[in-house]
Amino acid sequence: MEPVPGLSVRVFDTGWMEITRPDSADRLLCDEMGTAMWIALCQESWRLGDAVASLSRTWEADPWSIRDQMCDWIADLTDAGVLQH
């Protein structure tokens, strides 16, 4: 998995994140959780398991729960044309 080429990603002071594609005027807004998941994936070279482990330590949360949430979120981003496999 990786982002499609040419994305523009902007993180706001509120913790929300805006993702835009070069071929569309649409924008995708992510809340603080989505922003944290995006950053974790970037830091872990888009390896889901490593990003889950990092977030579960940071949030002191069940890694399986985080993995489920991330998989749902990744599916949404893939459907939106932001991520590719």
Kindly label every feature range from the protein language model.
Residues 29-85:
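Long, charge-rich, low-complexity alpha-helical segments
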